[in-house]
Curated annotation (Swiss-Prot):
It comes from the Eukaryota. It is found in: Plastid, Chloroplast. One of its GO terms (cellular component) is chloroplast. Belongs to the class-III pyridoxal-phosphate-dependent aminotransferase family. HemL subfamily. The modification N6-(pyridoxal phosphate)lysine is found at K306. The lineage of its organism: Eukaryota, Viridiplantae, Streptophyta, Embryophyta, Tracheophyta. Keywords: Chlorophyll biosynthesis, Chloroplast, Isomerase, Plastid, Porphyrin biosynthesis, Pyridoxal phosphate, Transit peptide. This is Glutamate-1-semialdehyde 2,1-aminomutase, chloroplastic. GO terms for molecular function: glutamate-1-semialdehyde 2,1-aminomutase activity; pyridoxal phosphate binding; transaminase activity. It comes from Glycine max (Soybean). Strongly expressed in leaves of etiolated plantlets independently of light treatment and, to a much lesser extent, in leaves of mature plants. Residues 1-28 form a transit peptide. Gene3D superfamilies: Aspartate Aminotransferase, domain 1 (3.90.1150.10), Type I PLP-dependent aspartate aminotransferase-like (Major domain) (3.40.640.10).
Length: 466
């Protein structure tokens, strides 16, 4: 196994062992019928999804859940606990999606549920300040190097919207730089060469986004320092902020090259531009202080979500005090939210952060995730597949391509049709992966060595079959 130059970021690079022609289409329509192509009984899920499509656009409330990029129809979940989930047909799965990242201590944790029960006795929403906001704010500020003040919101999208408005208000500039394949929520200015569901659907952006909304958004390939230099040269004194996922999770799992973050920190300082780390996914996931602590780079503004709400809707943005004091009511930059700082999300966040602060958390996540990724990659190579992948702590991913993968263009070389077959094969073996090649996976403290062994055994079987 190859080890990247980034400490702790293990990258396993598989060589091509197959001469078969592979599809390069990002949003390939894969024809799969779970009734014939899989061993699962999904009758109730099929009925529920058919009804859902008459009630909600596409039958879901977030596009990737519809299984568009893997074909077939989605499973409908009944319950979750620990590392497991059960669909309404009674099928059990080892879960590596973790509600797309929040479930770092496992699903439906007893301590979190008990704390939520006590909080609910006092009410579910106040629309006024509560002490729980102070407690979670103190935990976040103590943990994250860049954050001296924090504002809670209700989603990662809201957090990035707030950070964008704040960066523009603070600098008096309008242009921003984002990276191809990086996803910062569904706000108009960010839907330019975006990742996550946009990548899954194969859309370069989204209909309904006016040109004016994205006119000030500049893009560059991830890990491409030369492209960034050219953008700064061509837009001197105009760039308010550089936004990035410090580790990409919304175009698959892509790590930064060793000097990429330090380059961005240097060039932004030289140009009086703010550096914004979107740590909605990596915050409290790569270390207790997030990716910025892990890599030793301090941005000006950080966005958070997922883990800080312990599975409830939440988001946050924070940064240096002089920047954050621009936010109303301390300053002139307006942003508000009816349910921001609600007691339930604050409670779940407090319980979760206190748990993962305990010694050994990240060492354990690194150990089990490393075993998982190594096992899957080695099984794929033995079966003759081109595959590469890697992990940092409890975040991982793999691509059906020779690799290495340093940006979205590299990621799009992955054989998405093969991924779809692998996804359904693993699902039939009781393993739930993200239903898209272009999403990262997650482990939790609830995952056991036995879970990892079962998953690798399932992968070995599926790789032989596909």
């Amino acid at each position: 196994m190859a080890v990247s130059a980034i400490t702790g970021a293990r990258l396993t690079l598989g060589m091509s062992l197959s001469s078969s022609t592979r599809s390069r289409t990002v949003a390939m329509a894969v024809s799969i019928d779970p009734k014939t192509d899989n061993k699962l009984t999904l009758t109730k899920s099929e009925e529920a999804f058919a009804a859902a499509k008459e009630l909600m656009p596409g039958g879901v409330n977030s596009p990737v859940r519809a299984f568009k990029s893997v074909g077939g129809q989605p499973i409908v979940i009944d319950s979750v606990k620990g590392s497991r989930m059960w669909d309404i047909d009674g099928n059990e799965y080892i879960d590596y999606v973790g509600s797309w990242g929040p479930a770092i201590i496992g699903h439906a944790d007893d301590q979190v549920l008990a704390a939520l029960g006590e909080t609910m006795k006092k009410g579910t929403s106040f629309g006024a300040p509560c002490l729980l906001e102070n407690t979670l704010a103190e935990l976040v500020i103590d943990a994250v190097p860049s954050i001296e003040m924090v504002r809670f919101v209700n989603s990662g999208t809201e957090a990035c919207m707030g950070a964008l408005r704040l960066a523009r208000a603070y600098t008096g500039r309008e242009k921003i730089i984002k990276f191809e394949g990086c996803y910062h929520g569904h706000a108009d200015p960010f839907l330019v060469k975006a990742g996550s569901g946009v990548a899954t659907l194969g859309l370069p952006d989204s209909p309904g986004v006016p040109k004016a909304a994205t006119f000030e958004t500049l893009t560059a390939p991830y890990n491409d320092t030369e492209a960034i230099e050219k953008l700064f040269e061509a837009n001197k004194g105009e760039i308010a902020a550089v936004f990035l996922e410090p580790v990409v999770g919304n175009a698959g799992f892509i790590v930064p090259k060793p000097d990429f973050h330090s380059f961005l920190r240097k060039i932004t300082k030289e140009n009086n531009t703010l550096l914004v780390f979107d740590e909605v996914m990596t915050g409290f996931r790569l270390s207790y202080g997030g990716a910025q602590e892990y890599f030793g780079i301090t941005p000006d503004i950080t966005t958070l979500g997922k883990i800080i709400g312990g599975g409830l809707p939440v988001g946050a943005y924070g940064g240096r005090r002089d920047i954050m004091e621009k936010v109303a009511p301390a300053g002139p930059m307006y942003q508000a939210g009816t349910l921001s700082g609600n007691p339930l999300a604050m409670t779940a966040g407090i319980e979760t952060l206190q748990r993962i602060k305990e010694p050994g958390t990240y060492e354990y996540l690194d150990k089990i995730t490393g075993e998982l990724v190594e096992g899957i990659i080695e099984a794929g190579k033995r079966a003759g597949h081109a595959i590469c992948g890697g992990h940092i702590r409890g975040m991982f991913g793999f691509f059906f391509t020779e690799g290495p993968v340093y940006n979205f263009a590299d990621a799009k070389k992955s054989d998405t049709a093969k991924f779809a077959r692998f996804f359904w094969g693993m699902l039939a073996e009781g393993v739930y992966l993200a239903p898209s090649q272009f999403e990262a996976g997650f482990t939790s403290l609830a995952h056991t060595s036995d879970d990892i062994k079962k998953t690798i055994a399932a992968a070995e079987k599926v790789f032989r079959e596909i």
